[in-house]
């Protein structure tokens, strides 16, 4: 330690307090006239609004106790999905470096302008069409842009929209698929997290991007999962029906399954080494007999419990 500095700090600690002139206009704020608007504190105003709202709620509960359950249920309504998506991923969609390998516009200086318009129209479409799939959302957004934005021209529009899907977090992709179902806020968050971390996610990721047709015929998340992941007929592997979309082939799915379980035990780097030097078919058949069915069935049962709580 620098002893000279130590002595200096000790001297400062034991020094007399600073003196000031109480008549100094910068100090004498009590007698100084000023405009209240110059000292508006937004945080204080927001807190004041919150307290006023809280007092109104307290008065309502006091006067109408029978409304208590309804009041607290209203707090548990999730944000509209478009708003949630904008909060969580809107900035990522407007970062040019996320699209550096794609040629989106002729002039890079126009990227922010074009990207912000795409985001705005995409969110409008999402907000008003809770059942449509990602490709339809993108198509309607493009038609809206052509109608409302002059000289709108985007190169590689569909590649850009595929990249936007890739930038969405796993949990929000789950949220996109299930945004039309009537869920409470806490249920929505827990189910997004649960499915995002589950073996069902690779399939739901493809389903959400390419098809949401079953949402017109099923009216609950368990029924939706049962449609795509047929654990009741496990021996014939009908729960892999989403493979018919072609984006996840059987060999790729096998690798997904083996990686999923190895990742539970080993680090990400170690898993990559193991997956490159192991017999994927052997481990897949082993996991199929012991873990895959149990994992999917367990996830479904947990979701049912959450929805019934």
Swiss-Prot record:
Pfam families: DUF1139. InterPro entries: FDV_Vp7-2. This is Probable non-structural 36.3 kDa protein.
